[in-house]
């Protein structure tokens, strides 16, 4: 179904992982998609794939560091110049930072880096896209928070703090932008199967003296469904939140966690 036909979406972190799947799903649903990230080669390849697979709409790949204000402003202007306006923003860009690291051992530079990418890198695209959503008479913003922003997360102080901040940003913008018919929500994935999770498990196993299989089993045992979340699960939730069916959902967290927070 082309429920997003005629819509223009920006997806940050679109070179790989959740962002790449989100870009695919929005293109599948008919949207023109601006793929944003730092890996220009991967972005260009994915944009080409989307245009070949869904030729009735278009893609634009823009290499951009979401923590760089001038770069985000230029990216937004380039998107508007290409497509004439904007309707949807999905912020998936983010980093994990140090894991299994006590607060007293967590470097200040590392803490700032995680907050810069995860929080400032979510705020800046919002800042520059919002005027264009208002000009369209409405729109959708979806941020990626995480279950680590729903509870305390020991030994991951930078990441957890950043995801709590993203949830606060989401709620504040929902109140500010409601009068403009702009919905703002976030999704909260639990640990998500993929390359980043594989690296986290390997590092956690090394630090704790366990096997990777043991660490994986501990993660899945903590969920009601006994399994990992996959990138497609998160992309499905985001696809719904930017669709017409979600027009009266705003200011909310949508856990995609296989029942971790039950």
Predicted regions and their residues:
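Conserved glycine-rich cofactor-binding loop
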Residues: 8, 15-17
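Conserved glycine-rich Rossmann-like NAD(P)H-binding loop of the short-chain dehydrogenase/reductase
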Residues: 29-46
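Substrate-binding pocket helix/loop in short-chain dehydrogenase/reductase
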Residues: 99-103, 107-112, 141, 219
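Active-site helix of classical SDR
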Residues: 126, 162, 170
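Residue(s) in the substrate-gating loop at a strand-loop-helix junction
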Residues: 146
